[in-house]
Amino acid sequence: MTQMNVESFNLDHTKVKAPYIRLVGVTEGDKGDKIYKYDIRVKQPNQEHMDMPALHSLEHLMAENSRNHHDRIIDIGPMGCQTGFYLAVLNDDSYENILQVVENTLKDVLNATEVPACNEVQCGFAASHSLEGAQELARELLNKRNEWTEVF
């Protein structure tokens, strides 16, 4: 396989075992700050995917609630393949800390009564949401919490 610029294109998706959380890479800035990018894989690549309304709501819930557990979250966003999310954090090299942040955030999802910013003013596709779907995804991930560190 030819080496590509995008890290995930160099990952053999037939060998991974979802769910997992793995460090994708570290980017260091000119002043020494470091961005840690994580692959939060929810579904098994090429076998399963998240339905868009559930994925969209889980994105909103995780983006909003994760910042209650970590003050240096840069972004959390869905993968185009609908099998997971990317999480970027600033200057935190603790994998265990990130696992705890994700766990706490998913517990928040289970307790949510609404999807944040689920309206036409704050969201580009407000009609495509499912709180129940997001909560089911969170429940599935939490039920397999002991597997998150096993990528292959």
UniProtKB/Swiss-Prot annotation:
Q: Which family does it belong to?
A: Belongs to the LuxS family.
Q: Which HAMAP family does this one have?
A: LuxS (MF_00091)
**Pfam families per the record?**
LuxS
| Name of protein | S-ribosylhomocysteine lyase
Return the SUPFAM superfamilies for the record.
LuxS/MPP-like metallohydrolase
Function of the protein: Involved in the synthesis of autoinducer 2 (AI-2) which is secreted by bacteria and is used to communicate both the cell density and the metabolic potential of the environment. The regulation of gene expression in response to changes in cell density is called quorum sensing. Catalyzes the transformation of S-ribosylhomocysteine (RHC) to homocysteine (HC) and 4,5-dihydroxy-2,3-pentadione (DPD).
Show the catalytic activity: S-(5-deoxy-D-ribos-5-yl)-L-homocysteine = (S)-4,5-dihydroxypentane-2,3-dione + L-homocysteine
Q: Where on this chain does Fe cation bind? A: H56, H60, C123
EC numbers listed for it are 4.4.1.21
Q: Name one GO molecular function term.
A: iron ion binding
Q: How does it assemble?
A: Homodimer.
Induction per the UniProt record: Expression is growth phase-dependent, with maximal expression in the mid-exponential growth phase. Induced by high salt concentrations (at protein level).
Give the source species: Halobacillus halophilus (strain ATCC 35676 / DSM 2266 / JCM 20832 / KCTC 3685 / LMG 17431 / NBRC 102448 / NCIMB 2269) (Sporosarcina halophila)
Q: Which UniProt keywords apply?
A: Autoinducer synthesis, Iron, Lyase, Metal-binding, Quorum sensing
Return the Gene3D superfamilies for the record.
Answer: S-ribosylhomocysteinase (LuxS)
Q: Name one GO biological process term.
A: quorum sensing
Look at the named UniProt entry and state the broad enzyme category this protein falls under. Answer: lyase
Iron as UniProt keyword: yes
Q: Which InterPro entries match?
A: LuxS_sf, Metalloenz_LuxS/M16, S-ribosylhomocysteinase
- Cofactor comment: Binds 1 Fe cation per subunit.
Cofactor annotation: Fe cation
